[in-house]
Amino acid sequence: MHTDLRADQKAEVLIEALPWLEEFAGQRIVVKYGGNAMVDDHLKQCFAEDMVFLRQVGLHPIVVHGGGPQISHMLKALGIKSEFKGGLRVTTPEAMDVVRMVLTGKVSRELVGLINAHGPLAVGLSGEDGGLFSAMQRRPIIDGKPTDIGLVGDVVSVDASAVEDLVAAGRIPVVSSVAPNEEDATEVLNVNADSAAAALAAAVGARKLVILTDVDGLYADWPDKNSLIGRIGVENLRDMLPDLESGMRPKMEACVRAIDGGVPQAHIIDGRKPHSILNEIFTSAGIGTMVMPDEGLEMRSSYGY
């Protein structure tokens, strides 16, 4: 890959990464793959390269993905009505068949293929495999009352042994966000990939949870671009949750869940930027918003980078 950096600048980039390579060696990093990074061909390639890079320098990446745009496209192509209530997809049994097919048969296979173009590293599995996830059907409060949105659930338990086996074998697990209903194991639920990634990060003792989005991070006062938060304590974030817009709230709730589960750091980063994961992990400034177990709030504009 050609860059405009001089040789000495390239060396500076590598040296800046050295302490982070040392600090994160052998650590597990759970990455929620989503947003524009899933639909733009160049960004998909960059994401696959990032996962391979992490693996080759001694980290253990674990990928969890959804597939909202791909599901919507397939439902439309098949003439199946797609309804949303309170920003959540109503998942009928007919739609669930499509969700399962798209996530495990299309999105997962494509990402596994992109990673494995660099060597036999990635293995696809879903929340159904090896009892990885168990979920409970969800009845969210919409307009003040519990609402039936069909076969949609929240992960309530994790058996990470299948993922642990893959990590021990040097593989990169790629996990699709569907899960059996804990009350009826023959029924499969569509689960939120952000929440599933947080639950898995806690279960495997991940050093970081990284969630890819289509925004720069969490803003304290959107649309003021100077209000981009660089670091925020989990209690400060918990206080903000009720006022967050519907697209950002589940991602920040996932960060809270990860921190509450013992994950030291959770990040929201802009997946529209090529190699954003490497920029977050291996540079001093990082990018996006980092959630920490302690208290406090720092604006990214205060960093001086």
Curated annotation (Swiss-Prot):
Record-level Gene Ontology MF annotations: acetylglutamate kinase activity; ATP binding
Enzyme class: transferase
Listed Pfam families: AA_kinase
Binding site for substrate: 67-68, 89, 190
Compartments reported by the entry: Cytoplasm
Predominant location category: cytoplasm
InterPro entries associated with the record: AceGlu_kinase-like_sf, AcgluKinase_fam, ArgB, Asp/Glu/Uridylate_kinase, Glu/AcGlu_kinase, NAGK-C
Known role: Catalyzes the ATP-dependent phosphorylation of N-acetyl-L-glutamate.
Name this protein carries in UniProt: Acetylglutamate kinase
Organism: Bifidobacterium longum subsp. infantis (strain ATCC 15697 / DSM 20088 / JCM 1222 / NCTC 11817 / S12)
